[in-house]
Amino acid sequence: MKSAVKPSHYPSTDLPEIAFTGRSNVGKSSLINSLVNRKHLVKTSSTPGRTQLINFFIINKTISFVDLPGFGYAKVPDSVRKSWGPMIETYLSTRDTLKGVVLIMDIRRIPGLQELNFIEWLHYYHIPSILILTKSDKLSKIKQKNQHLSIAKALSVNQEELILFSAKSRMGKNEVWDAIGRLIEF
């Protein structure tokens, strides 16, 4: 693992990179750990805002997962939180090896302006995205279906563009890997 705050600290590598981001406490660390079958590759926490740097993880010497700080509520000083925006924007807009961004959202919450602005920003910079709804196991099948539809409408996307995921049951894990594979092929 390597951590960075500015481009001169980024690892020198030609490996394709997939960045992971989302609101604080949406299950980003659990998603990454589940994808690589490791419980503690990325530290999980119930305290929002634990990820404060850009963290690079090389996976099987073939791909790099990049863990970005979460946006929204975080128990960190305002000065730290304000530095995340430029740090993340610099990474996303300048990294040649970046193949796409996984935007992680909690299925129990309708996305807000931050998620909508982030998706718009990704479109502006022509950065492909994968949209994941985590914590799907926390809802009944009926509520899952209703939230899936409501979130698709809120984001103005088709339901098929939203992958339902559960770190607990591993639901959606293969779909996430398939989507990552499609991004890397470009």
Please state what every model-predicted region is.
Residues 14-15, 35, 78-81, 116-120, ...:
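Short, glycine/charged-enriched secondary-structure capping and boundary segments
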Residues 17-19, 104, 164:
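Short aromatic/hydrophobic contact patches that present stacked aromatics
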Residues 1-75, 185-186:
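Conserved G1/Walker A P-loop phosphate-binding module
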Residues 20-27, 32, 62, 100, ...:
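Structured catalytic cores of enzymes that bind and process phosphorylated ligands/cofactors
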Residues 1-7, 138-186:
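Canonical P-loop GTPase G-domain recognition
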Residues 10-13, 47-55, 69-99, 107-121:
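Switch II of P-loop NTPase G domains
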